[in-house]
């Protein structure tokens, strides 16, 4: 998909730890962090505090068990001092995109009153210690959210990019983590007296045929498979064209293929192919320098010159789908220009050669503008277009995308391969459906299970099961069976050693969400301290399968 990271970071990196400790102390010294006690109705099995109003018939709203009065020492971050500023930020500025999200944030969180945020824990030892109170470790909020700036060198000597890149022009997040980035993160930055990102853009989810993607349903779309079949640029174009900011978008193989055919093959690809072919056929590949204006020229030229400002405006508003729609309006206009000017008719009369050269030049320069503006969306294909239309690196600079007439008058073209081959829709859908069917869960013979002694619900409640995402995985040098997993458990990172190396390669596990037994006592396995255990199924002789969860389940979610 031509997606890569510039800098891979972990919250266990030394520089990040130093920065977080400095940030925590700075907020404490400013009076925004204070030590207190968390009091409330506590459910022991769920390890959760509840307010009186949250209880259901006086019991835990999650598991229905009895709750007890409990308290725990913790540090808190004051949220109330920032409530008014954050409400104005969300409702009176264009910080949040789409702005329609502001209503739910204000009504659900700010109007009821922002509660102070618990930012330390004493119930576990792993994490970043609070320098002035080592019994406490920094809880997830300050640790995780601050990595956006610590990775740039804020309060550390590792990097020197903070002044260069911060504040970010756009901070883009998914809708399920909107609250943290629209309320908590701005409050932290305000307390630190650091600038906020200029905009927070919240995108929706991609569904499949209107249904949530799920491995259990077998309808998860593999972008690598699609990229191999149609090219990364085609997939990037389809997804960005279909997704409107703030809304979920439904992915459909049929819609994708039809869009590739209509927009890319019949639209852009056909425009480039026809134009280059006519220059080669009628002028041997190089246009003469004489020009003769005629009907329809001004309309095309003005449309092409107006394209970059329109695209700039939509990108500034984080409306990438509209930016692409605007570009392809010009693609359609250029194809219509061919039909209006009928170059094949002009070519029949030698006296029309100058007019014909003008028509083809106008088309080539329009293609130059179109392809320059598409290069951020479709970076692999555009250089091929530039080579075909004879454009230099300077010709396709972003600055020149606002100008018409940049290509040399005697430009030379070079016909290349078909940019986007047409796809047989029915045949392709049949093959893709077969792939989906292949991925459907298969029924297997049930293994004989020897049961253990029954236990009570209270015994089971002692086990804390939690969703965790695998951040990194590597073999353990001293063992043939163990893999060392670095997990995000929703509160921080921890290391777990698991005897699954003969069943999984490390790169098959990275990014997966698994079930973690989170409250096992630490154990040392072949020199690795393991803080927990992941769940796997014994499917028979030499067959073990890790229990993977749906990727939409956030790390840290309790499993009951």
Regions found by a protein language model. Name each.
Residues 385-459:
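Intrinsic disorder at enzyme termini
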Residues 441-560:
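Phosphate-backbone binding interfaces of nucleic-acid-interacting proteins
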Residues 30-32, 155-164, 189-198, 317, ...:
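Secondary-structure transition/capping motifs at alpha-helix termini
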Residues 1-117, 152-161, 272-311, 331-352, ...:
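Conserved, charged catalytic cores of large soluble enzymes
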Residues 9-24, 29, 46, 63, ...:
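N-terminal catalytic cores of NTP/NDP-binding nucleotidyl/phosphoryl-transfer enzymes
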Residues 15-19, 45, 63, 69-281, ...:
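Structured secondary-structure scaffolds
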Residues 199-202, 386-388, 484:
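Beta-strand segments within the central parallel beta-sheet cores of soluble alpha/beta enzyme folds
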Residues 35, 242, 247, 255-293, ...:
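Helix-rich, typically C-terminal accessory recognition domains appended to large enzymatic cores
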């Amino acid at each position: 998909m031509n997606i890569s990271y510039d800098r891979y970071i972990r919250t266990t990196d030394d520089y990040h730890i130093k920065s977080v400790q400095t940030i925590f102390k700075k907020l404490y010294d400013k009076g925004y962090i204070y030590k207190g006690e968390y009091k409330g109705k506590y459910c022991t099995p769920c390890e959760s505090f509840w307010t009186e109003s949250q209880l259901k018939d006086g019991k835990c709203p999650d598991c229905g068990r009895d709750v007890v009065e409990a308290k725990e020492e913790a540090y808190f971050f004051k949220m109330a001092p920032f409530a008014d500023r954050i409400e104005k930020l969300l409702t009176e500025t264009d910080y949040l995109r789409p702005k329609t999200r502001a209503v739910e944030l204000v009504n659900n969180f700010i109007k009821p009153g922002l509660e102070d945020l618990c930012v330390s824990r004493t119930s576990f030892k792993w994490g970043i210690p609070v320098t002035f109170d080592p019994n406490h470790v920094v809880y997830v909020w300050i640790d995780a959210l601050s990595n956006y700036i610590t990775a740039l060198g804020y309060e550390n000597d590792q990097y020197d990019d903070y002044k260069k890149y911060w504040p970010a022009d756009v901070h883009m997040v998914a809708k399920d983590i909107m609250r943290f980035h629209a309320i908590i993160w701005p409050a932290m930055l305000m307390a630190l007296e650091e600038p906020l990102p200029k905009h927070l853009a919240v995108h929706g989810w991609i569904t499949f045929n209107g249904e949530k993607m799920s491995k259990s349903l077998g309808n998860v779309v593999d972008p690598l498979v699609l990229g191999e079949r149609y090219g990364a640029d085609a997939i990037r174009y389809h997804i960005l064209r279909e997704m409107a900011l703030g809304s979920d978008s439904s992915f459909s193989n049929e819609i994708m293929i039809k869009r590739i055919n209509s927009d890319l093959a019949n639209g852009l690809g056909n425009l480039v192919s026809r134009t280059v072919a006519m220059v080669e056929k009628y002028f041997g590949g190089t246009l003469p320098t004489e020009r003769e204006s005629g009907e329809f020229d001004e309309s095309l030229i003005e449309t092409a010159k107006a394209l970059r400002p329109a695209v700039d405006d939509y990108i500034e508003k984080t409306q990438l789908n509209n930016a692409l729609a605007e570009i392809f309006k010009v693609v359609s206009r250029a194809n219509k220009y061919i039909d209006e000017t009928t170059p094949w008719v002009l070519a029949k009369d030698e006296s029309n050669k100058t007019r014909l050269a003008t028509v083809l030049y106008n088309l080539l320069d329009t293609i130059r503008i179109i392809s320059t503006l598409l290069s951020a969306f479709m970076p692999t294909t555009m250089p091929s277009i530039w080579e075909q239309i004879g454009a230099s690196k300077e010709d396709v600079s972003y600055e020149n995308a606002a100008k018409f007439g940049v290509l040399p008058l005697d430009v030379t073209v070079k016909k290349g391969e078909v940019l986007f081959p047409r796809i047989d829709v029915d045949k392709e859908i049949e093959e893709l459906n077969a792939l989906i069917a292949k991925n459907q869960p298969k029924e297997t013979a049930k293994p004989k299970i020897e049961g253990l002694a029954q236990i009570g619900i209270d015994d089971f409640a002692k086990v804390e099961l939690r969703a965790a995402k695998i951040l990194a995985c590597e073999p353990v040098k001293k063992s043939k069976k163990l893999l060392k997993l670095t997990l995000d458990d929703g509160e921080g990172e921890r290391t777990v050693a698991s005897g699954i190396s003969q069943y999984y390669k490390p790169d098959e596990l990275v990014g997966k969400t698994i079930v973690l037994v989170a409250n096992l006592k630490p154990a040392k396995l072949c020199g690795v301290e393991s803080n927990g255990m992941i769940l796997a199924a014994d499917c028979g002789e030499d067959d073990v399968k890790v229990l993977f969860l749906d990727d939409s389940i956030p790390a840290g979610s309790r499993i009951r």
